[in-house]
Design a protein with these regions (language model features):
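A glycine-/small-polar-enriched, mobile loop at the entrance of the PLP active site in fold-type I
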Residues: 13-51
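Conserved PLP-enzyme active-site core in the AAT-like
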Residues: 2-22, 26, 53-67, 72-218
């Protein structure tokens, strides 16, 4: 087995927590044991996903669940679902989205490099509000009405990054979006712990919530 030392990588002291750029979180032995057991047999992946979906739904209270290769993959797949729904013809066109609604509204202050995962599905991000958090100008935060006035016939949904101090409240954004028959996708990659968020965030009735399982889910 190759160690990081053999690859010439120096040891580090992680004072950041479970961040992606440092590998998420070390896996406990029981998780590694489960990996080893699972790798001993073949399984139809669609049946495995269906079984995992039922387990995730029972744990979170959500309608269903999907295991993806990280939160970024969840955002891409979730956005694709928002863009095309059950339309097989539109599915074939992705990531080309000309000819049907392809705009996802997002608060400017919630933009980051990770939202490329949303654009990768073919969505065009429409920013609302001012970037007061980054600029520290202290004028005001994004308000709910700014999301609503940005809705056009090209709007396919709303993206929301959940975190301490996220504004406006997710529940308010969801309620407004659903009045316009639009879905809401939530990037909650960094919202574990606490474990209660596994239920608390889906309880807002957001349509899609992406959690990072490689950080704090045990």
């Amino acid at each position: 087995m190759t160690s990081y030392k053999e690859l010439g990588l120096p040891p580090i002291i992680n004072a950041c927590g479970t961040v992606t750029r440092l590998g998420g979180a070390p896996m406990p032995s029981r998780v590694l044991d489960a990996f080893q057991e699972a790798a001993k047999e073949w399984v139809p992946l669609e049946q495995l996903q269906a079984a995992a979906s039922r387990r995730i739904a029972a744990t979170t209270g959500a309608e269903a669940g999907l295991v993806t290769a990280g939160s970024a993959a969840a955002l891409t797949l979730g956005t694709a679902a928002m863009l095309v729904g059950q339309n097989l013809g539109h599915m074939e066109k992705l990531p080309q989205t000309d000819g049907f609604p392809n705009e996802i509204i997002i608060a400017r202050e919630q933009r980051s490099g990770y939202d490329h995962a949303i654009r990768a599905a073919g969505a065009r991000l429409v920013e609302v509000g001012f970037n007061e958090v980054t600029s520290n100008a202290g004028v005001r935060r994004v308000e709910l009405w700014e999301f609503e006035v940005a809705i056009t016939p090209q709007t396919a949904g709303i993206a929301y990054v959940h975190g301490p101090g996220s504004c406006p409240k997710l529940s308010e954004v969801v309620e407004m979006a659903h009045r316009h028959e639009l879905p809401v996708i939530v990037d909650a990659a960094g919202e574990l712990p606490p474990r209660e968020n596994l239920k608390r965030i889906p309880d807002t009735e957001a349509d899609l919530v992406a959690f990072s399982g490689g950080k704090a889910i045990r």
